[in-house]
Amino acid sequence: MDENALSEIKVPFLIRELEKSDEKITIARKAAAFVPDGSIVFLDASTSAYVMIPFLAEKRNLIVITNGVKALAKLSENHITCIGTGGNVVHSCLAFVGEDALRTIAEYNADFCFFSCRGLSEDGKITDIAQSENAVRRKMIEHAKSSYLLCTSDKIGKTCYHNLCTADDITGIIQA
């Protein structure tokens, strides 16, 4: 099977959480270093963003807005003020999507957006397999002053069938 074809398969959150875990920790630590106390942060429902939560817990007076079902519980456990987007739940990735999620995001202006994807092509296209999750990510990027892609090495050079944005549309890409 083609390596790019494998990236088109929806892998459940609980399995993805274990993949590239050391690399995700390095990326999460770097990403959290951008966030000063008192920031408002969008986190998507990716496992890479989820790994940031313990590092964000070291900050004071944050507000984190997320469409991640599992992220909400972790944020609460870490005593971080959190807002869930609500919406329809995609069970495989534990993400809220849909019009309710988009409306909630549009009500806020965040300082930062941290998100992940399934593919970052050599020409800078950021892609994923989930159109509904991409819509949520796009709305987060639109309503954040700065947006960063959290990118593990397995995503580089891959292209999935739904375009999210390009590297030129965001502030930066954080890698291990």
Regions found by a protein language model. Name each.
Residues 38, 59-61, 144, 170:
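A general structural motif
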Residues 18-22, 26, 47, 59, ...:
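Residues at secondary-structure transition points
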Residues 1-42, 53-58, 73-80:
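HTH-adjacent hinge/linker in prokaryotic transcriptional regulators
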Residues 70-176:
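Conserved phosphate- and dinucleotide-binding cores of soluble alpha/beta proteins
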Residues 62-65, 82:
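Short beta-strand element of Class I
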